[in-house]
Amino acid sequence: EQTGNKKRTGTTIRWLPDLDVFTDIDIPVDYYRDVMRRQAVVNAGVTFRLKNETAAGKFETEEFVYEHGIEDYIRELAGLDALTEPVYWEAERRGRDRPDKPEYKVKLSVALCFSNKTALCEYYHNSSFLEHGGSPEKATRSAMVSAIDKYLRDNNKYVKGEAKITFPDVQDCLILVSSSFSTQTSYENQTKKAITNKFIQEAMTEFLRSRLEIYFIENRDAAEKIAAQVLINKRSRETAERTRINQKKKLTEKIDIANRVQKFVDCRTKDVERREIYIVEG
């Protein structure tokens, strides 16, 4: 039923917080900027407009929009000197978390590139930012390590006896944003900052691993750059860890009270629980 002749559509919601519940309502404007920017990232082509009243009747307006969603966001993060060009992949899968659970559909979208200057991984589900990741993060870790390790082994990039790469070696040069939508969602807890869907994790792992393997075959130059940078990250991390352990060992030896101090010997007593120490000035 038509009740008016306005051309614009939509819903306007105005609300005031209950001060008995929300005792502190001084929310910084940066919080709203962050929320709107994230929503613009995962809702491609939708403009989010923030109007902030800085004085009576005076407003500052900001707009947030990414025409191509997470793909444009990746390009913004990577800049002009990334190791590889950003890529965007998407797929749909159907499945269930357990045999006794209902089947549901999930839509997967991933945009990524590699860089030796910027590193960031963000995960979204049903337009919500997953601060603690959960299933998408686990899938990314598994798929990335599996696909890149396979490329390194197949192309003899490891030196003899060298340990396998780990996800931190990849993460140090990875810019990745994933956005998924599903008709069934299991959250880790009430804060809803991580999802635990087993099927989403399995579907995304298989999807991302297969796309990466194809990408490495079709983009040899990019694959070589990725492999080289991941190995640099790995070997740098291992060198730093060895240095840290050696330094810790040296410092521990200097302060180890169990070591005998020069010109001091254990006192002699039949009671093994007693010791005597003389502290002499100088």
Kindly label every feature range from the protein language model:
Residues 1-281:
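GHKL-family ATPase ATP-binding module
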